[in-house]
Amino acid sequence: MTGTVLQVSTSRGGIPKRALLSAELTAAGVVGDAWRYPFHGGPRKAILLVTSEGIEELVAQGFTLFAGALGENLTTRGLDRRTMYFGQRFRVGHATIELTLMRTPCATLDVYGGGIQAAMYDALVQAGDPASPVWGLSGFYASVIEPGTVSPGDEVALITPPSRRRRR
């Protein structure tokens, strides 16, 4: 599975995040990025990755979204959210990340339209079941395994075997 980095984003806290020309990914997250609440971030939530295809699905449902709107650090093109799962490692530009957790959407996202939380997160997602039709729409948290620079246009390549790993 391969894709492309569409946008790298940061903010001083909250949403939306704004596009950068490039960014350094570290174990602590994207250099210069900040979180609004202390329960955001940390080594297992260093990066939030959202697919542009997922954003487009939500836009088709009437939500006013764009790259960075969901608070993601990495917006990708060409990755199938339905086949992504925890434990997968991806080479992203010069960095390596590992998917760790599904993002649980909060009321902050309601600014983009009522019902957005339900449109991207259901009981199956909460249980870690990729059979959910909304699997991955809320985004995947990732830890940074190998720090490095990432820029729009960089390749995103799966580097772990395609077998399923345990869900968290």
Please provide the spans of the model-predicted regions.
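Metal-cofactor-dependent catalytic cores
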Residues: 1-168
